[in-house]
UniProtKB/Swiss-Prot annotation:
Similarity comment: family membership: Belongs to the TNFAIP8 family. TNFAIP8L2 subfamily.
InterPro entries in UniProt: TNFAIP8-like, TNFAIP8_sf
Protein name: Tumor necrosis factor alpha-induced protein 8-like protein 2
The organism's place on the tree of life at top rank: Eukaryota
Oligomeric and partner information: May interact with CASP8; however, such result is unclear since could not reproduce the interaction with CASP8. Interacts with RAC1.
Compartmental location: Cytoplasm; Nucleus; Lysosome
Organism: Papio anubis (Olive baboon)
Length: 184
């Protein structure tokens, strides 16, 4: 007997459609203004650090695609109880990473690239476990790309260095607002 599920088919079509349209207009459906400002600042940091506009665009586009797909999966109730526990763990790790990034930005001489890189790597691993059975290997590659890019100790050291002070300030302002509003 053939197993057919219109709900599964609709979810698959929605993910496919959204992956093709991962631009600014679709992102605003799932990503609020403050998050968008943080993403814009992360793009600028990536562009300045890599000296490559296409590479910076790719990493942010991958980040948006992943965020949108995970939001669609969550909104459609695709995660089971154990996966919801993983989603909670991911959110806690992401929140811990944001609070650590803020602390490093606000207190002079406390920055440690290894600590922040470790937290981002933990986030990556939990997210990969969460979406293991829901997203394609290509999406798993996007997750690795995004987290590996932003957990690069060289990029993190540059971000907390004197040349990126303005960017770091804007990122910290956005993270603080997201934490205060309970969105992170």
């Amino acid at each position: 007997m053939e197993s057919f599920s219109s709900k599964s088919l609709a979810l698959q079509a929605e993910k496919k459609l959204l992956s093709k349209m991962a631009g600014r207009s679709v992102a605003h459906l799932f990503i609020d203004e403050t998050s968008s400002e943080v993403l814009d600042e992360l793009y600028r940091v990536s562009k300045e650090y890599t000296h490559s506009r296409p590479q910076a665009q790719r990493v942010i586009k991958d980040l948006i695609k992943v965020a949108v797909k995970v939001a669609v999966l969550h909104r459609n109730g695709s995660f089971g109880p154990s996966e919801l526990a993983l989603a909670t763990r991911f959110r806690q790790k992401l929140r811990q990473g944001a609070m650590t990034a803020l602390s490093f930005g606000e207190v002079d001489f406390t920055f440690e690239a290894a600590v922040l890189a470790g937290l981002l790597t933990e986030c990556r691993d939990v997210l990969l476990e969460l979406v293991e059975h829901h997203l394609t290997p290509k999406s798993h590659g996007r997750i690795r790309h995004v987290f590996d890019h932003f957990s690069d100790p060289g990029l993190l050291t540059a971000l907390y260095g004197p040349d990126f002070t303005q960017h770091l300030g804007k990122i910290c302002d956005g993270l603080r607002k997201l934490l205060d509003e309970g969105k992170l």
